[in-house]
Swiss-Prot record:
Organism: Bordetella pertussis (strain Tohama I / ATCC BAA-589 / NCTC 13251)
Gene Ontology molecular functions: ATP binding; GTP binding
Entry-linked InterPro entries: P-loop_NTPase (IPR027417), RapZ-like (IPR005337), RapZ-like_N (IPR053930), RapZ_C (IPR053931)
Its job: Displays ATPase and GTPase activities.
Name by which UniProt lists this protein: Nucleotide-binding protein BP0690
Transmembrane segments: none
Amino acid sequence: MLRVVLITGISGSGKSVALRLLEDAGFTCIDNLPVRFLAEFIANARDDAMERVAVAIDVRSPGELAELPDVITASRAMGTSLSVIFLDANTDTLVQRYSESRRRHPLTDRLARGGKTPSLAECIALERELMAPLRDQEHVIDTSDLTPGQLRAWIRDLIQADRPPLVLTFESFAYKRGVPSDADLMFDVRCLPNPYYDRTLRPLTGRDEPVATWLGGFDIVTQMIDDIAAFIRRWLPQYTQDTRNYLTVAIGCTGGQHRSVYVVEQLARRFSDHDPLLVRHRTQLPDDPA
């Protein structure tokens, strides 16, 4: 059976956040679909054997909003599982969000008269009036006091969507080339003993057994890895609960060849039970593909 989640509500209340969550949960998402196209879109999705679809509808087509309840009723009568989530927030919160984003309200031009620009409060008041027939359709969420993360969690619980697994990435890097911009957590291991000063180990990498044996012989190296692993294990559930999809842990040393590579490889072994798990080395190692 085709499942459709309809996201609507007051502009600035979080529809984009909700739609991105549904997209991450595997829904095919359409934003700002005019009401006149909704029935046809649902019919095509059913014919194409699509399973999960999410559609965001806002006030940009005000003349069509009154037709939406009938479209919803007809779609359900044809066997579509359709749920409606109406997002709202108090006017003060909406005004603050618009001020922070510096975006124009979609009804600004509609209310403009004689070259006079309407206030944001006037636009919001008209939008509430136009959206009133939809507010009592099904689920209403007041996002006034919700963070984006909380809103995503609420909607996930509401639609009982599976949480996408968090992709855990360990990457090594060289401080002399700069720090990676994609790192969520960063650990500096330049304080550890450096194999570079052993001429026999210098051309090797942290993935080679002689370097691994050399570094593994120092208690301070093992303790550093233990501490980093313990920190990640302690806080990984919280990062997952924060509804993020990726967590990148960067380990840096001077050249990105010995210590950071070894620590990353050891951490990857300790978290081998986490799926998906990625390992990246920013410095091209001798056995890497060109």
